[in-house]
Amino acid sequence: MKNKENEVLNLTLNLTIIFLIFCNISIXIFKIDFTKHKAFTISKVTKNLFSSANETIYITYYNSGSLENYFAFPNQIKNFLISFSDASKCKVIYKEIDADKISTPLEHIGIPSQQIDLRDINQLSILKIYSGIEIIYEGKREVIPVVTEISNLEYDLANGLDKLINNTKKVLGLAFGDSTLKEAHKNFSEIMKKAFGIEIKEIDLKTEKLEDIRKDINGLFIIGAKEIDEEIAKKIDDFIVNDGKIFVATSTIDYNPQNPYGITPIKSSLFDLFESYGIKYNDNIILDKRAPTIFLGGNFQTYYPWILIDKSNIVKKDMPLLKNFYTATIPWSSSLELIKKDETEVKFLPLFASSKQSWQVKEPNLSNISLNAFEVPNKFEENKTKILGYAIEGKIKSPYKDQYSKNSKIILTGSSMIFSDYMYNGSPSNFELSGRISDYLMQKEEFFNIKSREVRAKLKFASSSNEMVNAKFSLIIVNLIILPTIILIFGLVRFTRKRKAN
């Protein structure tokens, strides 16, 4: 019986030692990702791109070596790119170059210098740095000009590889249903190209036929509705029922921030079209007590016509479009109302809403919005939220002819200023939403799911993350305490057994 107990103990100690040694080896050889959200695990989408590549992919990370003295992100990026290369099964050759040690300016390949203010970490200086990635495949080049975190790095790399390997073109049509809004969106095309690699093709709804350009664009953005008559509405309907993908940013109120007292309601055939589909645009502007604070008139003030959208007021939290989305600000928005029920072949998906402490302003009080934009009413009309965005998916029936779409995608928002230049300064995260909407319309869901994963990292000063500290501490405990202790016990047991045997 005693011999049997000794054998069991001996086997247990052997297996424990083997397991602990395996844990150490697996980190270096098998590249097992122990981070909470699998920060360094490459998705199936990217691996499929590797399989499609017929030639070697060259990825170079240019970064200033001095960065590592102040920030943690260069090492995070390097570790991620090493994991990226390992996952490619020799399809990717990765190298890093210290930008401080090369004489040729990186601007010539599209990687600009950045200035980082070090006063936040008690350094009285401003550091000029580079941190960008170059991808080369079959002599073609894609560049990620600025990289300071790994949260969206796989998405950016996969997009670049998709363009190089599959010759994918990302082109969005941009049409203004109100020509006066062009001035407020002068930078939109440039932002979309720089941030998401999306080409913008501007379309004149009055003169151009959408059926002629349907094959040239992946989706259509329409901003404003004031000048859309029934003839143009029919063009838009024809685009939709022929499976065109569309995003609409418009309000029922003609509001210009430069002329805040000249507020008038808008009548448009575009509203009639969407009402026939099942969504009504209400004649109001929504104000919300839970609005962001902005710098206006020399002071920081809570500006109630700007509605803060975050996890708390995202309605469809499981929808990939808004999964793991942070924040956006919806300015001067009308509310949207569902007037049809979900049907078997059509889904109506509410996206985001105001808070319960919100209120609406209608005629004849619209001109008072600017006067009362910083005042909260004593009581709210209703203790419920107002929907500010809807998605429609499925087979949509045209109100003008007997035709159904096969699989339409429409996103409607109640603000014509959501992606305006005002918001680029006031709420830059709005343009993260524009990129997500673009992917959604382009039916690049597989790429979109990369971006919908839990955030991998944030820009940090040169202090290791909690996960990294915990991992190092665990390895110290295993290697310096647990493993030696078990080996010592194993040796003592063997020694004791031999002495007794003798």
UniProtKB/Swiss-Prot annotation:
Location (main, coarse) = membrane
State one Pfam family annotation.
ABC_transp_aux
**Taxonomically, which superkingdom?**
Bacteria
Subcellular localization, per the record?
A: Cell membrane
Membrane topology, record value: Multi-pass membrane protein
Entry keyword set: Cell membrane, Membrane, Transmembrane, Transmembrane helix
Q: What is this protein called?
A: Uncharacterized protein BB_0752
Q: What is the lineage of its organism?
A: Bacteria, Pseudomonadati, Spirochaetota, Spirochaetia, Spirochaetales
